[in-house]
Amino acid sequence: MKNILIFPFLSISTGHHHVADALQAELESQGLAAEKIDIFSHSYRRLEKLSSVAYLKWIQYFPKTYSGIYRLLACGEFQHDKRYFMYEWLFTQQMRHILQEKQPDIAFCTHALPSYLLNRLKPEYPNLTVVNVYTDFFVNQLWGRKNIDYHFVPSTEVKKQLISEGIDQNNIYLTGIPVHQNFEMESADTLQHHPPYTIIITGGSMGVGGILKWVQELSPGGKILYKILCGRNEKLYSYVKSLHHPLIEAIPYLHSKAEMNRLYEQATGIMTKPGGVTISECLQKRLPVFIYHALPGQEEMNLNLLHERKLVTDMRNWDMQKAEEYIAAFFQSNEQMKEYKKHVNGYLGEMSDRKIKDVLKRIIWKQKNTLLK
Protein backbone atom coordinates (compact mmCIF):
# COMPACT_ATOMS: atom_id res chain seq x y z
CA MET A 1 0.00 0.00 0.00
CA LYS A 2 1.37 3.39 -0.99
CA ASN A 3 1.77 6.08 1.66
CA ILE A 4 0.52 9.29 0.07
CA LEU A 5 0.45 12.83 1.47
CA ILE A 6 -1.28 15.89 0.02
CA PHE A 7 -0.10 19.34 1.08
CA PRO A 8 -2.48 22.33 0.77
CA PHE A 9 -1.81 25.45 2.89
CA LEU A 10 -3.84 27.35 5.51
CA SER A 11 -7.11 26.01 6.89
CA ILE A 12 -9.43 28.40 5.04
CA SER A 13 -11.43 26.80 2.23
CA THR A 14 -9.47 27.89 -0.84
CA GLY A 15 -8.74 26.29 -4.19
CA HIS A 16 -5.69 24.59 -2.69
CA HIS A 17 -8.00 22.55 -0.46
CA HIS A 18 -10.57 21.88 -3.19
CA VAL A 19 -7.88 20.45 -5.46
CA ALA A 20 -6.45 18.45 -2.55
CA ASP A 21 -9.95 17.04 -1.92
CA ALA A 22 -10.29 16.16 -5.61
CA LEU A 23 -6.98 14.29 -5.59
CA GLN A 24 -7.85 12.54 -2.34
CA ALA A 25 -11.22 11.38 -3.70
CA GLU A 26 -9.65 10.12 -6.93
CA LEU A 27 -6.94 8.21 -5.08
CA GLU A 28 -9.48 6.69 -2.70
CA SER A 29 -11.58 5.56 -5.66
CA GLN A 30 -8.48 3.60 -6.74
CA GLY A 31 -8.20 2.00 -3.29
CA LEU A 32 -5.36 4.27 -2.13
CA ALA A 33 -5.45 6.19 1.15
CA ALA A 34 -4.12 9.75 1.09
CA GLU A 35 -3.72 12.11 4.03
CA LYS A 36 -4.07 15.89 3.78
CA ILE A 37 -1.68 17.93 5.91
CA ASP A 38 -1.52 21.72 6.21
CA ILE A 39 1.99 22.31 7.49
CA PHE A 40 1.05 25.69 8.99
CA SER A 41 -1.79 24.49 11.24
CA HIS A 42 0.12 21.25 11.86
CA SER A 43 3.08 23.25 13.21
CA TYR A 44 1.61 26.49 14.58
CA ARG A 45 -2.13 26.01 15.11
CA ARG A 46 -2.86 29.30 16.89
CA LEU A 47 -0.62 31.33 14.61
CA GLU A 48 -2.27 29.76 11.55
CA LYS A 49 -5.74 30.85 12.67
CA LEU A 50 -4.49 34.37 13.29
CA SER A 51 -2.71 34.44 9.93
CA SER A 52 -5.81 33.25 8.07
CA VAL A 53 -7.91 36.04 9.58
CA ALA A 54 -5.17 38.60 8.90
CA TYR A 55 -4.89 37.44 5.27
CA LEU A 56 -8.63 37.86 4.66
CA LYS A 57 -8.67 41.28 6.31
CA TRP A 58 -5.62 42.39 4.31
CA ILE A 59 -7.11 41.59 0.91
CA GLN A 60 -10.46 43.05 1.99
CA TYR A 61 -9.26 46.40 3.34
CA PHE A 62 -5.90 46.94 1.61
CA PRO A 63 -6.27 45.21 -1.77
CA LYS A 64 -3.83 47.41 -3.69
CA THR A 65 -1.09 46.89 -1.10
CA TYR A 66 -1.58 43.12 -1.18
CA SER A 67 -1.60 43.11 -4.98
CA GLY A 68 1.63 45.10 -5.17
CA ILE A 69 3.47 42.94 -2.63
CA TYR A 70 2.21 39.73 -4.26
CA ARG A 71 3.48 40.82 -7.67
CA LEU A 72 6.81 41.89 -6.18
CA LEU A 73 7.46 38.69 -4.22
CA ALA A 74 5.75 35.98 -6.23
CA CYS A 75 5.65 37.08 -9.85
CA GLY A 76 8.21 38.00 -12.45
CA GLU A 77 10.95 35.92 -14.03
CA PHE A 78 11.82 32.72 -12.18
CA GLN A 79 15.20 32.67 -10.43
CA HIS A 80 16.59 29.19 -9.76
CA ASP A 81 18.70 30.30 -6.81
CA LYS A 82 16.12 32.52 -5.09
CA ARG A 83 15.72 31.67 -1.39
CA TYR A 84 12.87 32.43 1.01
CA PHE A 85 14.72 32.28 4.32
CA MET A 86 11.74 33.17 6.53
CA TYR A 87 9.74 30.23 5.15
CA GLU A 88 12.74 27.94 5.54
CA TRP A 89 13.26 29.06 9.14
CA LEU A 90 9.60 28.56 10.04
CA PHE A 91 8.82 25.33 8.23
CA THR A 92 11.85 23.29 7.11
CA GLN A 93 12.29 21.38 10.36
CA GLN A 94 8.52 20.90 10.65
CA MET A 95 8.43 19.38 7.16
CA ARG A 96 11.33 17.06 8.06
CA HIS A 97 9.38 15.85 11.10
CA ILE A 98 6.33 15.11 8.94
CA LEU A 99 8.39 13.19 6.39
CA GLN A 100 10.16 11.18 9.08
CA GLU A 101 6.91 10.38 10.87
CA LYS A 102 4.74 9.60 7.84
CA GLN A 103 7.40 8.09 5.53
CA PRO A 104 5.45 9.02 2.37
CA ASP A 105 6.10 7.43 -1.02
CA ILE A 106 4.40 10.27 -2.90
CA ALA A 107 3.67 13.88 -1.93
CA PHE A 108 1.26 16.08 -3.89
CA CYS A 109 1.60 19.84 -3.37
CA THR A 110 -1.43 22.01 -4.12
CA HIS A 111 0.25 25.14 -2.76
CA ALA A 112 3.58 26.74 -3.59
CA LEU A 113 5.01 26.80 -0.04
CA PRO A 114 5.11 23.03 0.63
CA SER A 115 6.40 22.62 -2.92
CA TYR A 116 9.25 25.02 -2.17
CA LEU A 117 10.12 23.16 1.04
CA LEU A 118 10.01 19.71 -0.55
CA ASN A 119 12.06 20.93 -3.50
CA ARG A 120 14.81 21.89 -1.05
CA LEU A 121 14.50 18.72 1.05
CA LYS A 122 14.19 16.24 -1.83
CA PRO A 123 17.93 15.36 -1.96
CA GLU A 124 17.55 14.00 1.59
CA TYR A 125 14.65 11.76 0.49
CA PRO A 126 15.63 10.38 -2.95
CA ASN A 127 12.85 7.75 -2.98
CA LEU A 128 10.11 10.33 -2.41
CA THR A 129 8.11 11.32 -5.49
CA VAL A 130 6.97 14.96 -5.36
CA VAL A 131 4.21 16.32 -7.61
CA ASN A 132 3.27 19.97 -8.13
CA VAL A 133 -0.46 20.40 -8.76
CA TYR A 134 -1.02 24.01 -9.83
CA THR A 135 -4.29 25.58 -8.72
CA ASP A 136 -4.15 28.83 -10.71
CA PHE A 137 -3.65 29.58 -14.39
CA PHE A 138 -0.10 30.80 -13.80
CA VAL A 139 2.92 29.67 -11.75
CA ASN A 140 4.54 32.01 -9.24
CA GLN A 141 8.20 32.03 -8.25
CA LEU A 142 7.73 30.19 -4.95
CA TRP A 143 6.81 26.84 -6.49
CA GLY A 144 9.68 24.34 -6.48
CA ARG A 145 11.11 23.34 -9.85
CA LYS A 146 14.48 21.58 -9.93
CA ASN A 147 13.78 18.57 -7.70
CA ILE A 148 10.07 18.17 -8.40
CA ASP A 149 9.29 14.91 -10.20
CA TYR A 150 6.02 15.79 -11.96
CA HIS A 151 3.93 18.85 -12.76
CA PHE A 152 0.14 18.96 -13.32
CA VAL A 153 -0.25 22.16 -15.34
CA PRO A 154 -3.34 24.25 -16.17
CA SER A 155 -2.45 25.30 -19.73
CA THR A 156 -0.06 25.00 -22.65
CA GLU A 157 1.31 28.42 -21.70
CA VAL A 158 2.41 27.13 -18.28
CA LYS A 159 3.88 24.01 -19.88
CA LYS A 160 5.97 26.17 -22.22
CA GLN A 161 7.06 28.34 -19.28
CA LEU A 162 8.26 25.35 -17.27
CA ILE A 163 10.11 23.88 -20.26
CA SER A 164 11.85 27.24 -20.75
CA GLU A 165 12.92 27.04 -17.08
CA GLY A 166 14.57 23.68 -17.62
CA ILE A 167 11.80 21.21 -16.75
CA ASP A 168 11.74 18.00 -18.83
CA GLN A 169 8.55 18.04 -20.90
CA ASN A 170 8.07 14.31 -20.20
CA ASN A 171 7.46 15.21 -16.55
CA ILE A 172 4.71 17.72 -17.35
CA TYR A 173 1.07 16.64 -17.58
CA LEU A 174 -1.56 18.86 -19.19
CA THR A 175 -4.32 18.05 -16.72
CA GLY A 176 -5.88 21.47 -16.34
CA ILE A 177 -6.62 22.44 -12.74
CA PRO A 178 -7.97 19.17 -11.29
CA VAL A 179 -11.62 19.21 -10.26
CA HIS A 180 -13.57 16.73 -8.17
CA GLN A 181 -14.68 13.63 -10.07
CA ASN A 182 -18.33 14.69 -9.61
CA PHE A 183 -17.72 17.54 -12.07
CA GLU A 184 -15.85 15.51 -14.65
CA MET A 185 -18.94 14.24 -16.41
CA GLU A 186 -19.45 16.75 -19.19
CA SER A 187 -22.92 18.20 -19.59
CA ALA A 188 -24.78 17.80 -22.82
CA ASP A 189 -25.80 21.05 -24.47
CA THR A 190 -28.63 21.78 -22.05
CA LEU A 191 -28.16 25.55 -21.97
CA GLN A 192 -31.45 27.40 -22.05
CA HIS A 193 -31.97 29.25 -25.31
CA HIS A 194 -34.79 31.41 -24.02
CA PRO A 195 -35.40 33.42 -20.82
CA PRO A 196 -35.61 33.26 -17.92
CA TYR A 197 -31.99 32.11 -17.79
CA THR A 198 -30.66 30.62 -14.56
CA ILE A 199 -27.51 32.36 -13.34
CA ILE A 200 -25.56 31.21 -10.28
CA ILE A 201 -23.73 33.95 -8.39
CA THR A 202 -20.90 32.58 -6.29
CA GLY A 203 -17.65 33.71 -4.69
CA GLY A 204 -18.85 35.12 -1.37
CA SER A 205 -18.43 32.23 1.05
CA MET A 206 -15.46 33.81 2.85
CA GLY A 207 -17.10 37.20 3.20
CA VAL A 208 -14.57 39.06 1.04
CA GLY A 209 -14.96 40.44 -2.44
CA GLY A 210 -17.79 42.37 -4.02
CA ILE A 211 -20.62 39.85 -3.93
CA LEU A 212 -22.87 41.65 -1.41
CA LYS A 213 -22.51 44.96 -3.25
CA TRP A 214 -23.27 43.22 -6.53
CA VAL A 215 -26.37 41.50 -5.14
CA GLN A 216 -27.60 44.77 -3.64
CA GLU A 217 -27.44 46.36 -7.08
CA LEU A 218 -29.22 43.56 -8.92
CA SER A 219 -32.14 44.79 -10.94
CA PRO A 220 -34.14 41.72 -12.05
CA GLY A 221 -36.18 42.40 -15.16
CA GLY A 222 -37.64 38.94 -15.68
CA LYS A 223 -34.99 37.60 -18.06
CA ILE A 224 -32.81 35.99 -15.39
CA LEU A 225 -33.38 33.88 -12.27
CA TYR A 226 -30.48 34.59 -9.90
CA LYS A 227 -29.34 31.85 -7.51
CA ILE A 228 -26.95 33.26 -4.90
CA LEU A 229 -24.57 30.65 -3.50
CA CYS A 230 -23.98 31.96 0.03
CA GLY A 231 -21.74 29.26 1.50
CA ARG A 232 -21.12 30.01 5.19
CA ASN A 233 -21.70 33.74 4.70
CA GLU A 234 -24.69 34.19 7.03
CA LYS A 235 -24.86 37.94 6.41
CA LEU A 236 -25.26 37.39 2.68
CA TYR A 237 -27.78 34.58 3.15
CA SER A 238 -29.93 36.63 5.53
CA TYR A 239 -29.86 39.64 3.21
CA VAL A 240 -30.93 37.65 0.14
CA LYS A 241 -33.71 35.89 2.07
CA SER A 242 -34.97 39.24 3.36
CA LEU A 243 -35.53 40.46 -0.21
CA HIS A 244 -38.40 38.01 -0.74
CA HIS A 245 -37.83 38.41 -4.48
CA PRO A 246 -39.15 35.64 -6.76
CA LEU A 247 -36.15 36.01 -9.10
CA ILE A 248 -33.41 36.13 -6.44
CA GLU A 249 -32.90 32.88 -4.55
CA ALA A 250 -30.54 32.27 -1.62
CA ILE A 251 -28.70 28.94 -1.69
CA PRO A 252 -27.31 27.91 1.73
CA TYR A 253 -24.07 26.02 2.30
CA LEU A 254 -23.90 22.91 0.13
CA HIS A 255 -22.56 19.85 1.92
CA SER A 256 -21.38 17.85 -1.07
CA LYS A 257 -19.82 18.17 -4.50
CA ALA A 258 -22.79 16.22 -5.87
CA GLU A 259 -25.14 19.00 -4.71
CA MET A 260 -22.93 21.60 -6.39
CA ASN A 261 -22.86 19.56 -9.57
CA ARG A 262 -26.67 19.40 -9.61
CA LEU A 263 -26.75 23.19 -9.26
CA TYR A 264 -24.35 23.53 -12.19
CA GLU A 265 -26.59 21.24 -14.23
CA GLN A 266 -29.52 23.62 -13.67
CA ALA A 267 -27.54 26.74 -14.63
CA THR A 268 -27.23 28.66 -17.87
CA GLY A 269 -24.18 30.59 -16.69
CA ILE A 270 -22.12 31.66 -13.67
CA MET A 271 -21.23 35.04 -12.17
CA THR A 272 -18.15 34.61 -10.02
CA LYS A 273 -14.61 35.65 -9.14
CA PRO A 274 -11.72 34.14 -11.14
CA GLY A 275 -10.58 31.50 -8.67
CA GLY A 276 -8.77 28.70 -10.48
CA VAL A 277 -10.94 25.83 -9.26
CA THR A 278 -14.33 27.48 -9.82
CA ILE A 279 -13.32 28.51 -13.32
CA SER A 280 -12.07 24.99 -14.08
CA GLU A 281 -15.34 23.48 -12.90
CA CYS A 282 -17.26 25.84 -15.17
CA LEU A 283 -14.99 25.12 -18.13
CA GLN A 284 -15.46 21.40 -17.53
CA LYS A 285 -19.24 21.91 -17.51
CA ARG A 286 -18.97 24.37 -20.44
CA LEU A 287 -20.86 27.02 -18.50
CA PRO A 288 -20.30 30.64 -19.62
CA VAL A 289 -18.53 32.63 -16.90
CA PHE A 290 -19.09 36.32 -16.09
CA ILE A 291 -16.55 37.93 -13.75
CA TYR A 292 -17.99 40.58 -11.41
CA HIS A 293 -14.94 41.01 -9.14
CA ALA A 294 -11.34 39.85 -8.77
CA LEU A 295 -9.45 39.71 -5.49
CA PRO A 296 -5.91 41.12 -5.56
CA GLY A 297 -3.03 38.80 -6.34
CA GLN A 298 -3.88 35.39 -7.78
CA GLU A 299 -7.36 36.25 -9.03
CA GLU A 300 -6.13 39.35 -10.84
CA MET A 301 -3.48 37.26 -12.58
CA ASN A 302 -6.00 34.54 -13.45
CA LEU A 303 -8.41 37.07 -14.90
CA ASN A 304 -5.80 38.61 -17.18
CA LEU A 305 -4.91 35.20 -18.61
CA LEU A 306 -8.50 33.97 -18.91
CA HIS A 307 -9.67 37.19 -20.54
CA GLU A 308 -6.78 37.05 -22.99
CA ARG A 309 -7.92 33.58 -24.06
CA LYS A 310 -11.58 34.70 -24.17
CA LEU A 311 -12.63 32.02 -21.70
CA VAL A 312 -14.54 34.46 -19.46
CA THR A 313 -16.46 37.72 -19.80
CA ASP A 314 -15.24 40.61 -17.65
CA MET A 315 -18.30 42.52 -16.41
CA ARG A 316 -16.63 44.61 -13.69
CA ASN A 317 -17.15 47.88 -15.57
CA TRP A 318 -20.64 47.19 -16.82
CA ASP A 319 -23.55 49.51 -16.10
CA MET A 320 -25.31 47.51 -13.39
CA GLN A 321 -28.75 48.56 -14.54
CA LYS A 322 -28.06 47.08 -17.97
CA ALA A 323 -26.18 43.95 -16.89
CA GLU A 324 -29.21 41.69 -17.24
CA GLU A 325 -29.81 42.90 -20.79
CA TYR A 326 -26.18 42.25 -21.71
CA ILE A 327 -26.23 38.73 -20.29
CA ALA A 328 -29.54 37.85 -21.94
CA ALA A 329 -28.24 39.21 -25.24
CA PHE A 330 -25.16 36.98 -24.89
CA PHE A 331 -27.28 33.83 -24.58
CA GLN A 332 -29.62 34.89 -27.37
CA SER A 333 -26.75 35.55 -29.78
CA ASN A 334 -25.84 32.46 -31.81
CA GLU A 335 -22.62 34.18 -32.85
CA GLN A 336 -21.48 34.92 -29.28
CA MET A 337 -22.39 31.44 -28.06
CA LYS A 338 -20.57 29.83 -31.00
CA GLU A 339 -17.49 31.96 -30.29
CA TYR A 340 -17.58 31.06 -26.60
CA LYS A 341 -17.82 27.33 -27.33
CA LYS A 342 -14.94 27.58 -29.80
CA HIS A 343 -12.61 29.07 -27.19
CA VAL A 344 -13.64 26.65 -24.42
CA ASN A 345 -13.39 23.61 -26.68
CA GLY A 346 -10.00 24.86 -27.85
CA TYR A 347 -8.77 25.11 -24.26
CA LEU A 348 -10.16 21.71 -23.22
CA GLY A 349 -8.75 20.16 -26.38
CA GLU A 350 -5.25 21.15 -25.26
CA MET A 351 -5.60 19.14 -22.06
CA SER A 352 -4.03 15.91 -23.31
CA ASP A 353 -4.02 14.47 -19.78
CA ARG A 354 -7.49 15.53 -18.64
CA LYS A 355 -8.31 12.09 -17.19
CA ILE A 356 -6.61 12.61 -13.85
CA LYS A 357 -7.22 9.01 -12.77
CA ASP A 358 -5.05 7.74 -15.63
CA VAL A 359 -2.26 10.19 -14.79
CA LEU A 360 -2.32 9.14 -11.13
CA LYS A 361 -2.14 5.46 -12.09
CA ARG A 362 0.84 6.19 -14.33
CA ILE A 363 2.72 8.08 -11.60
CA ILE A 364 2.05 5.42 -8.98
CA TRP A 365 3.20 2.70 -11.39
CA LYS A 366 6.40 4.63 -12.17
CA GLN A 367 7.08 5.20 -8.47
CA LYS A 368 6.61 1.50 -7.73
CA ASN A 369 8.99 0.46 -10.52
CA THR A 370 11.59 2.99 -9.38
CA LEU A 371 11.66 1.47 -5.90
CA LEU A 372 12.04 -2.05 -7.35
CA LYS A 373 15.16 -1.13 -9.31
Swiss-Prot record:
Pfam families, from UniProt? MGDG_synth (PF06925)
Q: Which GO biological process annotations does it have?
A: glycolipid biosynthetic process
Q: Which terms are listed as keywords in the entry?
A: Glycosyltransferase, Transferase
EC class, as a word, reads transferase
| Any one annotated GO CC term | membrane
Gene Ontology molecular functions: hexosyltransferase activity
Q: Which Gene3D superfamilies match?
A: Glycogen Phosphorylase B
E.C. number: 2.4.-.-
Q: Does the keyword Transferase apply?
A: yes
User: What does the similarity note say?
Assistant: Belongs to the glycosyltransferase 28 family.
Question: By what name is this protein known?
Answer: Uncharacterized glycosyltransferase YkoN
